[in-house]
Amino acid sequence: TGDVIDFIHILGSVLDLGVPSDSTVSLAKLTATGTKDATTFLRGDNSFAVPSGGKIGQVLQSHKIDQFSTTNGIGGTGFTDITGLSQAITPSATSSKILIIANIYISSSGTGSRQYYRIEKGGTAIGLPSAMSSGTAVFGSNYNWHSTTSTVMMSLVYLDSPSTTSATTYNISTTHNGNDGDATVRINFQANSGNGVNDDNGTSNITLMEVLA
């Protein structure tokens, strides 16, 4: 008990026990249970398994480098789509989720005004708060309290379940509360001019990631 056989003599000759050389053992020779192929991996309990969910299937991005502005307020026609901040994606399975990440470089020319932002899918706002007795349902907002020269990067993040394999378009829309006579929402440039040596211009983007089930 506990002894190890190093070799065996048969009629005066050493019997080779057949220790396999490197990289010569096939999957079929392994005792592990489960399906053995390129889609599985060997676990510590000697079984093959399919990797769990959470894999990223595809990543798409729309990067907006030009300027955009709108004077549309909630007292007017409401929300306006920000040109260039939209991206389409075609999910590979109905069980997939879409992670939406939007970074918007914003400013407003109206001191004391508030800008509102929404994420839309196919033209319909998503991720909004539950029913409200008053007020405006938004995904994100910014209050321009300082001056017409203030800028900020607004980030919107949402995990959507489109339940489709058809092409789906997501976009960002904006409006303002109209508290200032010149409450213009500006995207990618500073409100006062955006062209001086001390004025800052920026870029915005919307990124879509398909998260596989």
Task: List each language-model region with its residue ranges.
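Local beta-strand/beta-hairpin segments that build beta-sheet-rich folds
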Residues: 56-57, 81-84, 126-128
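Short, surface-exposed loop/turn motifs at beta-strand boundaries within globular domains
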Residues: 23, 35, 55, 80-82, ...
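Short, flexible micro-motifs
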Residues: 47, 76, 81
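Terminal beta-strand-rich extracellular "head" domains
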Residues: 71-78, 88-97, 101-167, 171-213
